């Protein structure tokens, strides 16, 4: 509960595979770079065919073209586009993103690699996070304690339009899903979701991370 400060967790500090949830700290780091004038949302970025990554998202379906940095961020967030995430990592640098993660005092989160082709099963280096760290990211956005409040709210608003709402939001009635900002993550045996919920009862964060689930249906319904 972001207003009262009450929290409950189970294994909330266990470092686990982040999957697509890693795109949340990547986006925060990008917005911080824009705030610090190290990047500009209107910068044009060309995405070439050999840079495209199979998996979630849509950029890999298009011919080579230019995108603004803002467009890449939005596509990365609302469609969990892997190619967009990799271009942003290239622009910011993995070291800078991890420095921003440390600046937010997130002790169990680390970007270890770019996103990979989802057809590859032998990737043994993973990006890591914890349920507590993901909830803390929402708290930073809500309170304006890393980004300014305007930019924090902008990111919350973008994630409200996130198109993959088939995990935690599956259990919420359709007319309330507009009150949820979320970032999902999944890969073989992993089903993750982190949410910011805002309604008349208050402002809440809710995160579930899972590993070694036998299949995606089991991971979603349990």
Please place each PLM-identified region on the residue numbering:
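Conserved catalytic neighborhood of penicillin-recognizing serine enzymes
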Residues: 52-88, 124-127
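Active-site-proximal beta-strand/loop segments in catalytic clefts of secreted hydrolases
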Residues: 1-2, 49, 77-80, 113-114, ...
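Structured C-terminal helix/loop/strand segments within mature extracytoplasmic catalytic/sensor domains
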Residues: 7, 91-95, 136-168, 172-179, ...
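Active-site SXXK
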Residues: 5, 16-45, 206
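Short, well-structured active-site flanking segments
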Residues: 32-51, 99, 148-152
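Acidic helix-start/capping segments at beta-turn-to-alpha-helix junctions
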Residues: 41-57, 92-93, 158
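A short, well-structured edge-of-sheet supersecondary motif
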Residues: 1-12, 43, 197-198
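Mid-domain, small-residue-enriched loop/turn segments at the edges of structured enzyme/sensor domains
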Residues: 86-143
């Amino acid at each position: 509960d972001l207003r009262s400060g009450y929290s409950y967790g189970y294994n909330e500090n266990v470092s686990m595979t982040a999957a697509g949830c890693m795109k949340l700290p990547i986006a925060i780091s990008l917005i911080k770079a824009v705030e610090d004038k190290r990047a500009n949302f209107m910068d044009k970025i060309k995405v070439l065919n050999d840079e495209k990554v199979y998996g979630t998202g849509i950029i890999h379906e298009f011919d080579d073209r230019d995108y603004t940095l803002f467009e890449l961020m939005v596509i990365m967030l609302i469609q969990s586009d892997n190619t967009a995430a990799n271009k942003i990592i290239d622009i910011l640098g993995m070291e800078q993103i991890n420095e921003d993660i440390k600046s937010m005092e997130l002790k169990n989160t680390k970007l270890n690699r770019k996103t990979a082709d989802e057809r590859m099963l032998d990737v043994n280096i993973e990006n890591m996070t914890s349920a507590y760290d993901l909830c803390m990211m929402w708290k930073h956005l809500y309170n304006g304690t890393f980004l300014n409040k305007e930019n924090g709210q902008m990111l919350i608003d973008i994630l409200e339009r996130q198109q993959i709402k088939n995990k935690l939001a599956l259990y919420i009635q359709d007319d309330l899903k507009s009150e949820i900002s979320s970032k999902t993550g999944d890969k073989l045996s992993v089903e993750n979701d982190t949410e910011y919920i805002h309604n008349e009862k208050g402002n809440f964060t809710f995160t579930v991370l899972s590993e070694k689930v036998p299949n995606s249906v089991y991971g979603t319904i349990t």
